[in-house]
């Protein structure tokens, strides 16, 4: 019969503490890539919609993660991560 593991390892920090640290890291990264006015408007929208709740914090984290992912995927000029679009040569010299 299957038994649960006896040792779960070291206890993780509380969820709320970890969540707030994650939000702070995402905000710090977002201000390096997006206009402050845009981020302020997003924060106001989240606050007006969810108030000062954990649901609002989780929503803000999800939106910032999505924005940063798309930003890097498109090709951020501040990062080496992303798609580097190469110009196609019309003379056919790149063909083998």
Swiss-Prot record:
Keyword Membrane appears in the UniProt entry: no
Alphabetical list of InterPro entries matching this protein: RetroV_VpR/X (IPR000012)
Keyword vocabulary terms for this entry: Activator, AIDS, Apoptosis, Cell cycle, Host G2/M cell cycle arrest by virus, Host nucleus, Host-virus interaction, Ion channel, Ion transport, Modulation of host cell cycle by virus, Phosphoprotein, Transcription, Transcription regulation, Transport, Viral penetration into host nucleus, Virion, Virus entry into host cell
Post-translational modification: Phosphorylated on several residues by host. These phosphorylations regulate VPR activity for the nuclear import of the HIV-1 pre-integration complex.
Function: During virus replication, may deplete host UNG protein, and incude G2-M cell cycle arrest. Acts by targeting specific host proteins for degradation by the 26S proteasome, through association with the cellular CUL4A-DDB1 E3 ligase complex by direct interaction with host VPRPB/DCAF-1. Cell cycle arrest reportedly occurs within hours of infection and is not blocked by antiviral agents, suggesting that it is initiated by the VPR carried into the virion. Additionally, VPR induces apoptosis in a cell cycle dependent manner suggesting that these two effects are mechanistically linked.
HAMAP family (UniProt xref): HIV_VPR
Similarity-based family: Belongs to the HIV-1 VPR protein family.
Protein name per the record: Protein Vpr
Native source organism of the sequence: Human immunodeficiency virus type 1 group M subtype F2 (isolate MP255) (HIV-1)
Gene designation: vpr
